[in-house]
Swiss-Prot record:
Annotated source species: Pectobacterium atrosepticum (strain SCRI 1043 / ATCC BAA-672)
Role, per record: Removes 5-oxoproline from various penultimate amino acid residues except L-proline.
GO CC list: cytosol
Active site: E80, C143, H167
Protein name as catalogued: Pyrrolidone-carboxylate peptidase
EC number: 3.4.19.3
BP-aspect Gene Ontology terms: proteolysis
Length: 215
């Protein structure tokens, strides 16, 4: 049976939970659309997170890797288009590291595009009634670090495995502590991930629909 690896993060910046892991952990060792899903929780730490990711890829030998992370303030499922080769941490990670203007990979290319059909995934989520959009930036913190490191590793291995990154909003419990911020219930995020997994099984090439932004 084919395997899809989904990663998520531990809590950071004083939060009690990370909604990415709350949504992802329920999929571990489940069958979705005829594939086995395995989940891995990453540390919110520069470099260590990539070590953990690479070990999980080596252990599970997946056909697809979907990394998931929290983006407090976003209102929908954000399917990331691109990762850039820069670490520029506005806050420290969970071990106190705060790199500024350092590369994720020394002498690596400036950026990598997701190898997932990002627009098709967003379209599938819309059909399922789940708010979603294409995002043009994964930030410059550990999420972008993981996305870039993932795509670099997969490229080094011949781009046989597809990979990308998805940002999700706060959970309602978190939003209650951040007045005015949007949220999405954890079961809906889990359902969104299932929709994306099923779409990936039938969609290799992206669809030609707009997913751009004016700013």
């Amino acid at each position: 049976m084919k395997t899809v690896l989904i990663t998520a993060f531990e809590p950071f910046e004083g939060e009690a939970i990370n909604p990415s892991w709350e949504a992802v952990k329920d999929l571990h060792q489940r069958e979705v659309g005829g594939v086995r899903v395995v989940a891995c929780r990453l540390s919110c730490v520069f470099d260590l997170s990539l070590d953990q990711l690479y070990r999980a890829i080596a252990e599970w030998q997946p056909e697809v890797v979907i990394a998931v992370g929290q983006a407090g303030g976003r209102a929908d499922i954000s399917v990331e288009r691109v990762a850039i080769n820069i670490n520029d941490a506005r806050i420290a990670d969970n071990r106190g590291n705060q790199p500024i203007d350092t590369p994720v990979v020394e002498k690596g290319p400036a950026a990598y595009f997701s190898t997932l059909p990002v627009k098709a995934l967003v379209q599938a989520l819309h059909v399922a009634g789940i708010p979603a959009s294409v995002s043009q930036t994964a930030g410059t913190f550990v999420c972008n670090h993981v996305m870039y490191g993932l795509l670099h590793q997969l490229h080094q291995q011949g781009d046989v495995v597809r990979g990308g990154f998805v940002h999700i909003p706060y959970s309602p419990e978190q939003a209650a502590r951040h007045p005015g911020e949007p949220s999405m219930p954890t079961p809906l995020v889990t359902a969104a991930l299932e929709v994306m997994i099923k779409q990936l099984l039938v969609q290799q090439v992206d669809v030609a629909i707009t997913g751009g932004a004016l700013h």
